[in-house]
Structures are given as structure tokens and as C-alpha cells.
Amino acid sequence: MRRVVAAVLVMLLPARAVPAQASPTLPYSATWADAGWVTAGGALSLLPRTLGLPHGSQACAPCDPATLPGVDRWAVRPVSKSADAASSVVLAGVAAWTALAGLRGLPADQWHGNFAAFAETASWTAASTEWLKVIVRRRRPVLYTSGAVAAAGDRGNQESLPSGHAALAFAAATSYLVMSGHQHLPHRTRNVLLLYVGAAGVSALRVAAAQHFPTDVVAGAALGMGIGWLVPTIHPTINQP
């Protein structure tokens, strides 16, 4: 969870704004209401861990891999700490590149609005992911291995679906895709390609690390793309009353 929160914070870090010659098309608004939405999403994302959710212990340790869908069985293996760490590093890179590509060099009103939209996307993706983990309560791959007994006491091992890393990475990439299309930001094709390749890399590393099943990262990617599309699509612009 701490790595996911850290990745969210990196995604929200601003890049320095510099003067521009022309006004952007339909800049997003940035108001105190946006700050409220970001704060609410961030608070909701931290609430499950604060409340010690999910409650209860594992019914099986180890669990039977035969109960898994065929597409997920091959992902059952011991946790790889190196792949786990690499997935967080790549996620931080995706978040940083999103901020750089979507904020740098813009006039103040556009920069502030884009920052607000990115922040709302990140906070509500994190909140949605954390609560879905609690509701779905799917076991991580480690609970199907010989290391299940030692891992069973960690509540986080009951929170496999959806993948928070995948959700945040694809939310960042998709929010930039939508925003750059509306505002005709420079180098859009290159940046979109890099961001989606990075997001796919994050997802692959989560499976390689045995932190998630393939269906977990697919669910996370779908969730992230949905929120990444929705927030910048409905975010009000300065031209709106």
C-alpha cells in the first residue's frame, strides 16, 4: 500500500510552468472544489488500511491452485522481491512522465487545470482500487504456494484484485491521452506510446513478481482506463459557466 500511495504522490508532483505564447484550447478549471475531491479520494484510499480491512483470516493456507481459472494458474510461484521493486520503479516513471508531458511549459491557467485533473484521476483511482480489493478479497498467488502459512497473516495478501499498480499506471496514461487530445499537446503520439508501454510493463512485472494474477492486472488496467477517461472528460473547463 505504501508503494501505491508513493506512486500517487509522484503522479501529483507538479512540473514547472513556463510562459507560453498562445492560450490553450478549453483549459480545465482549478477550484477549491477540486482540492476537496482530491482530498476525499485520498482519504477514502487510506481508510481500509486505517480500519484494518479486510477483517478475518484465510480459510486455506495453502489454497488449491486447481480452484483458479486456467489463465491464472501459471502465475502461482514464490514472490520475487526484485520484480516487485521494479514494478514500483516503473510505475513512478509512468507517473513522472505523465506529469512532465501534461504540465511542463504550459501557461498558468492550463497548468493548474491539468494538475487538478491529474490529481483527481490519481486519487479516485487509488480509492476505487483499495475498496474493490476489500470487497472482492481475492487471495494473492503466494497463498497457493508452500509459503502460504507464513503469508496468511498479512491482510494485504487478501487484496489481489484489482492490481493497484496497473490501475494507477493505466489511469495516468489514459488521462494524458484524453487531455492531450483535447488540448493538442506537443509530442502526443510519442508520449502516449511511452506511457502505455510503461503501463503494460508495470502490469507484466506485477505478475512476474507473483503479486497478482493476470486477471488482476487486466481488471486494474480496465479500472484505470475507465477513470482515466472519465475524469478529464467530465472535468469542467474555464470556458464553461
Please provide the spans of the model-predicted regions.
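Bacterial N-terminal signal peptides that target proteins for export
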Residues: 1-5
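Bacterial N-terminal signal peptides
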Residues: 6-14
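Membrane-embedded catalytic cores of phosphoryl/pyrophosphoryl-handling enzymes
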Residues: 8, 145-241
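Boundary at the C-terminal end of the N-terminal hydrophobic targeting segment
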Residues: 17-22, 110
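N-terminal transmembrane-helix/juxtamembrane module of multi-pass inner/ER membrane proteins
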Residues: 21-97, 133-156
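Interfacial segments of alpha-helical transmembrane regions
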Residues: 38, 104-128
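Alpha-helical transmembrane segments of multipass membrane proteins
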Residues: 44-49, 124-129, 133, 202, ...
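Small-polar-interrupted transmembrane alpha-helices in polytopic inner-membrane proteins
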Residues: 97-98, 120-137, 188-205
